[in-house]
Amino acid sequence: MSKNVILKADNLYKSYTTGKESFEALRGVSLSLEQGEMLAVMGSSGSGKSTLLHILGAMDAADKGEIRLNGELREDYGTEPAATKIRAEQIGFIFQDFNLIQDLTVEENVALPLMLAGENNRVIWDKTDQMLEKVGILEKKKNAITELSGGQRQRVSIARALITEPKLLLADEPTGNLDYNTSIEIMQLFLELQQEQDHSIIIVTHDAMVAGYTDRILFLHDGQVCDEYRCRKNGDDMDHIVDKFKTLSLKKGR
């Protein structure tokens, strides 16, 4: 039996205008994500992958198209005040540059979404400890962000994304600033969240190793889905994923 579709996007378009120039970032992109599925979005620079993730994360609004979240058509998706509520309650977003507040401790960064929501202190700090333990960094909770390695900072970012208990996680190049071994550790953490907590995850990446951890890969080129690949998740298809990405890069250079 197939699982419930947690997120479905149909025929998304997005354009940006700079001066007299207009640029189509997305041209009719459609996708669906099942509960407990992990999906990678790959594409060369300028393919529209980050724009797509920001729209799916209710951080921007599409010009045209439909988005259904948990089966509900949301015509207000990406527009305020609905977008803030969607982000706060249903989506966890993880950034490449971690997006942490340097003046706060580890635990304060993780607790911030609950503080802003007006949760009571006991719930805030109990859940903060739970999330930090889940990502394997509880012993660093009193540390300053500046005292952490890149991998540790990304774990803090993931814990913060989890604190409101969203079922949907969106990650924009989550290993982009990490070395190879640390990237593997972070992807294994995502895999644990998927398999043990039934999280649905979309990861934008240019890294074939990262994409190989997911269930499916959508390849974007020039604002459109140009290919889709279902991963074996055993490492045997890494060369195939790399070849597909190289093909997109060659198209970009023409």
Q: What are these model-derived regions, one by one?
A:
Residues 20, 74-92, 238-239:
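ABC ATPase NBD coupling module
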Residues 57:
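Helix-to-loop junction immediately C-terminal to a conserved catalytic motif
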Residues 65-75:
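Conserved ABC transporter NBD signature motif
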Residues 104-112:
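Short coil-to-helix segment of the ABC ATPase nucleotide-binding domain corresponding to the Q-loop/switch region
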Residues 144-148, 152-154:
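Conserved ABC ATPase signature
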Residues 163-167:
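A short, proline-enriched helix->beta-strand linker immediately N-terminal to the Walker B motif
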Residues 169-172:
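Catalytic Walker B motif of ABC-type/P-loop ATPase nucleotide-binding domains
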